[in-house]
Amino acid sequence: MPRPAYRSRSLRRVKVKTPGGRTVVHYEKRAKGVPKCAVTGQPLGGMNSKVYRFGISTRAPSRPYGGVVSHKVLARAIRYAVRR
């Protein structure tokens, strides 16, 4: 049985063949998903998702709700707020 830290499903199990011919299980972190819009669920453009060592403020666009909602949703919300 693996030790308690490796029993979590947040780690991905990968079967690896060793040079000696045995098959062992390696535990890896799961791949991160693409940032998505909170309203529509579509992938966000403008997010620099390749650079994870920087914070969200560096990666996200510098507009209001940048990195949270898509530009189309934001434009629609601004139009709605102005017209009311």
Swiss-Prot record:
Annotated InterPro entries: Ribosomal_eL34, Ribosomal_eL34_C_sf, Ribosomal_eL34_CS, Ribosomal_L34e_arc-type
Listed GO CC annotations: ribonucleoprotein complex; ribosome
Species whose genome carries this gene: Pyrobaculum calidifontis (strain DSM 21063 / JCM 11548 / VA1)
Gene3D superfamilies from the UniProt entry: 6.20.340.10, 6.20.370.70
Coiled-coil residue windows: none
Name of the protein in question: Large ribosomal subunit protein eL34
GO BP terms, alphabetized: translation
GO MF assignments: structural constituent of ribosome
Keyword Ribonucleoprotein tagged: yes
Keyword presence, Aminoacyl-tRNA synthetase: no
Assigned keywords, A-Z: Ribonucleoprotein, Ribosomal protein
Similarity comment: Belongs to the eukaryotic ribosomal protein eL34 family.
HAMAP family hit by this protein: Ribosomal_eL34
Pfam family, one: Ribosomal_L34e
